[in-house]
């Protein structure tokens, strides 16, 4: 019962009529006038375009190079086979993509039940016909890629991005990921006590069997609620940008002097002066290095050339050297 004239009614009756395992009617009432169409249209659009699911995206058929061809001993042409594969209802657990195989020979229909798959894959409608073999010696072998996605993605959207690496004979298929095949809603009159201007929303939908209709409605409502959360609190809810911290020093400065691959004489002279890292070395001047016992002009020239090849030089000034990671060693 409504508490005040400004308080909105909330639906108090939900009736779910399960016509079949893939077909159901969901009734929601009472709704304020106009809310039947508001909610019905929003849920319908989400159910048709935004529900996640699995679909066939690529097919390879032995002996077939392109979709505008036929295969000997097969009643259907390749385009019709691809169209039949689009209707394959597959449920995949724990993976974003799987590759299924199909091998069949001899006269008769080729159905989804002939597909070989592992335990993570369930073929919901094994009786679904893919093609017909018309000769005893006829056979067909194919590899079918099934991917997880959302909504509808035409093959043309993937052609340009995959053209360079797509081998000849790999056929792209328009992917309809949504498990909802048909949905319609109707708004009828509802009554609560003396109010007769209320709405009753009736949603009728059919799925491909990979999801229960009731669960589909629940997921669509969850998606809608999550999208509307930002409007509940209109303050800036953007996530703070995580700034990538730049290293205090060039990583090459933290490497040991041994990485410069100096001659044994030059390397030993530097170690005797406690110059262990490249960062230690570049802060020394030519005059300072020439004062090092046994380090002459030839060794100095070698050191300068090696540093120059790495974009470094002697006499550099490094603030806050050494870093904590080196100082603690």
Swiss-Prot record:
InterPro entries on file: DNA-dir_RNA_pol_insert, DNA-dir_RNA_pol_RpoA/D/Rpb3, DNA-dir_RpoA, RBP11-like, RNAP_asu_C, RNApol_insert_sf
EC class (word): transferase
Family annotation (Pfam families): RNA_pol_A_bac, RNA_pol_A_CTD, RNA_pol_L
GO CC, alphabetical: cytoplasm; DNA-directed RNA polymerase complex
Region annotation Alpha C-terminal domain (alpha-CTD): where it falls in the sequence: 249-329
GO biological process terms, semicolon-separated: DNA-templated transcription
The keyword Ligase is assigned to this record: no
Region annotation (Alpha N-terminal domain (alpha-NTD)) ranges: 1-235
Hydrolase keyword on record: no
Highest rank taxon of the organism: Bacteria
Reaction equation(s) it catalyzes: RNA(n) + a ribonucleoside 5'-triphosphate = RNA(n+1) + diphosphate
Entry keyword set: DNA-directed RNA polymerase, Nucleotidyltransferase, Transcription, Transferase
Quaternary structure and partners: Homodimer. The RNAP catalytic core consists of 2 alpha, 1 beta, 1 beta' and 1 omega subunit. When a sigma factor is associated with the core the holoenzyme is formed, which can initiate transcription.
This protein's domain notes: The N-terminal domain is essential for RNAP assembly and basal transcription, whereas the C-terminal domain is involved in interaction with transcriptional regulators and with upstream promoter elements.
Family according to the record: Belongs to the RNA polymerase alpha chain family.
Function statement: DNA-dependent RNA polymerase catalyzes the transcription of DNA into RNA using the four ribonucleoside triphosphates as substrates.
Protein name stated in the entry: DNA-directed RNA polymerase subunit alpha
Species of the source: Cronobacter sakazakii (strain ATCC BAA-894)
């Amino acid at each position: 019962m409504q508490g005040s004239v400004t308080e909105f009614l909330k639906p108090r009756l939900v009736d779910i009529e399960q016509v079949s395992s893939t077909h159901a009617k969901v009734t929601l009432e009472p709704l304020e006038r106009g809310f039947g169409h508001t909610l019905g249209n929003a849920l319908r659009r989400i159910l048709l375009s935004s529900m996640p699911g699995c679909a066939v995206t690529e097919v390879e058929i032995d002996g077939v190079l392109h979709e505008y061809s036929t295969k000997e001993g097969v009643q259907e042409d390749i385009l019709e086979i691809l169209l039949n594969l689009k209707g394959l209802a597959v449920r995949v657990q724990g993976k974003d993509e799987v590759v299924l195989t199909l091998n069949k020979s001899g006269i008769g229909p080729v159905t989804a039940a002939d597909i070989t798959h592992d335990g993570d894959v369930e073929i919901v409608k094994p009786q679904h016909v893919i093609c017909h073999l018309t000769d005893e010696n006829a056979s067909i072998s194919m590899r079918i890629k099934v991917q997880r996605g959302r909504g509808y993605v035409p093959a043309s959207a993937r052609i340009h991005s995959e053209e360079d690496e797509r081998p000849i004979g790999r056929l792209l298929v328009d992917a309809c990921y949504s498990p909802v095949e048909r949905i319609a809603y109707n708004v009828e009159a509802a009554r609560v006590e003396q109010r007769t201007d209320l709405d009753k929303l009736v949603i009728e939908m059919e799925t491909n069997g990979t999801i229960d209709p009731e669960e589909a409605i629940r997921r669509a409502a969850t998606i809608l609620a999550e999208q509307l959360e930002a409007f509940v609190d209109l303050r800036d809810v953007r996530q703070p940008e995580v700034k990538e911290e730049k290293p205090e020093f060039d990583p090459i400065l933290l490497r040991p002097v041994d990485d410069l691959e100096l001659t044994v004489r030059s390397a030993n002279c530097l170690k005797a002066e406690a110059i262990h890292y490249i960062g230690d070395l570049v802060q020394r001047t030519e005059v300072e290095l020439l004062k090092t016992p046994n380090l002459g002009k030839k060794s100095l020239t070698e050191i300068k050339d090696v540093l120059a090849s790495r974009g470094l030089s002697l006499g550099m000034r490094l603030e806050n050297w050494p870093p904590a990671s080196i100082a603690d060693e």
